[in-house]
């Protein structure tokens, strides 16, 4: 029996959106993505206790300063979890930069270099890592610098066409346009509460971005993210990559209904437009209330979970 997950794998690279190693073993994705919220929830699992202890011991050996120890411990824990995941997935792990650095280009670059150095010290080459950065103007500029250094980036919390365009123009390796959070916003801010998959505003957004990239010949990978239901996933079958939570991977694995490819650009490739200026980026991005609100909210939520992680680690330092 061919499952929908099998069919999806034939047209899209399937990525697991989790830090749960047992789930990754079960669904055998090509890559895995983590974020501060997923690191926080993974840290509560008993099998991660040794990774936390090792990160704390590492931090204590690096510095006597408590504030520095905390920074080192959280960076090392994120990498430790990534290292465990890389024992299972054949492809890449996405590890996220502290969301509180989202508006600081230089600090983002420095944090990314540090995370890469920790992976390199553990014997992992750059081609197995993606550094996740929020798709702010400052984050996109940081990614532009990092890509030139051979550090590939995954630009996340992407909600607007302006963000997508700026990422492609910066030569970013991969973007993660969010689907479910866009749907959440439209449900909360309009009278319409139910959407068929084909009319889901998150699905429409990713479809537009995918077609724009193919139309202008951008090499940046489009990886749809943040799904609320299987319908959103099947409606994006054919997207370069899709990062999917274990509960939805399970649904796809248990369903054998035929899957039809939905995304496939067959038109001509056009000459690329002039890159957006900073002023144009902000005007276009800020013209989309949903994108403005969801980007800011996403950064706040990741920062809150980063702080919860710090509270947990502080008790051990």
From Swiss-Prot:
GO MF term set: transaldolase activity
Alphabetized InterPro entries for the sequence: Aldolase_TIM, TAL/FSA, Transaldolase_1, Transaldolase_AS
Catalytic activity: D-sedoheptulose 7-phosphate + D-glyceraldehyde 3-phosphate = D-erythrose 4-phosphate + beta-D-fructose 6-phosphate
Protein's pathway: Carbohydrate degradation; pentose phosphate pathway; D-glyceraldehyde 3-phosphate and beta-D-fructose 6-phosphate from D-ribose 5-phosphate and D-xylulose 5-phosphate (non-oxidative stage): step 2/3
Main localisation: cytoplasm
Subcellular location: Cytoplasm
Gene Ontology terms: biological process: carbohydrate metabolic process; pentose-phosphate shunt, non-oxidative branch
This protein's GO CC annotations: cytosol
PANTHER family: TRANSALDOLASE (PTHR10683:SF18)
Family: Belongs to the transaldolase family. Type 1 subfamily.
The protein, known as: Transaldolase
UniProt organism field: Haemophilus influenzae (strain ATCC 51907 / DSM 11121 / KW20 / Rd)
Gene: tal
